Design a protein with these regions (language model features):
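P-loop NTPase nucleotide-binding/switch module
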Residues: 9-38
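Cofactor-binding active-site loop characterized by glycine-rich and histidine/acidic residues
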Residues: 2
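Long insertion/accessory domains within large nucleic-acid-processing enzymes
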Residues: 28-44, 49-52, 57
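C-terminal interaction appendages of subunits in large macromolecular complexes
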Residues: 5-9, 14-17, 48, 54-250
Length: 250
């Protein structure tokens, strides 16, 4: 139910000749070639997929920021990527985590290809009367707690991770994600945390390869190009809708 208004915004106008319809794969019925899409859904939702000879991987973005960026480009067609990043500073990752550095994001926004690092959101606090611990409350995008725990135990057993006495998953519906990594006495929690970033998915990398179909042809798109394709599409949708309504009332 929460997604219903946004879903309707993607299809509003289908009954007003705003887009072309084409046969489905077995010619059983007609389906829209594209959706009218009242917001830049490719950027907002992100995308990931593999086809013959190509692949795409686009991070999700904040809806309000993406719309603000599109409006700015509409008002300022010569806007640079740096200008647009004032409105769209980076991806909005639903699982949370912390994006480390902007260089990879800027490269991806300029060229359509790039990578950036994400880290878990953590805090160091006392977990027992005598021991300190590392509390994980958010994980990098697409990383689950089971994978993290598995890697911690695997590296600790192999001697590649030192200073960890236990790890517990205390996640629940009320408090959300909570991993408690207990640090052995005599070890610096900050040093242990740096080991965890190096050896486990508490630090991960996300690669952007923004390939999308434009006019039926695959193209690698930077941020400005992606927003411009959306604006051109909306101009076409609005023009077709206006013609449909005028013809209807003639």
């Amino acid at each position: 139910a929460r997604m219903a208004p946004a879903a309707l915004d993607l299809v509003t106008g289908l009954d007003e000749d705003t887009v072309d319809f084409v046969p489905n794969y077995d010619n059983q019925f007609m389906q829209p070639d594209v959706l009218p899409a009242a917001f830049p859904q490719l950027l907002v939702n992100g995308a990931s997929g593999i086809a013959v000879g190509m692949a795409t991987n686009i991070a999700p973005h904040n809806l309000s920021e993406t719309i603000a960026g599109a409006i700015h480009l509409l008002d300022n067609p010569s806007a640079s990527v740096a200008d647009l990043m004032r409105y769209i500073p980076g991806p909005d990752l639903p699982e949370g985590g912390v994006i480390v550095g902007l260089d990879g994001i800027k490269e991806a926004y300029e060229s359509g290809r790039g990578a950036f690092k994400t880290r878990a959101k953590v805090q160091i606090e006392r977990v027992t009367a005598r021991k300190m611990g590392i509390i994980v409350t958010q994980l990098p995008y697409m990383v689950g707690p089971e994978k993290v725990i598995e890697k911690i135990k695997e590296n600790a057993n192999a001697g590649r991770l030192k200073g960890i006495s236990s790890v517990q998953n205390l996640t629940d519906r009320i408090h959300g994600l909570r991993l408690v990594i207990e640090v052995k006495n005599g070890f610096n929690p900050e040093a242990v945390l740096q080991q965890l970033y190096q050896r486990t998915p508490l630090e991960d990398s996300f690669s952007i390869n923004a390939v999308a179909l434009v006019g039926g042809q695959p193209r690698t798109l930077g941020l400005k190009e992606m927003l411009q394709v959306f604006l051109d599409h909306r101009l076409d949708v609005t023009t077709r809708r206006s013609r449909f309504r005028l013809k209807k009332y003639e």
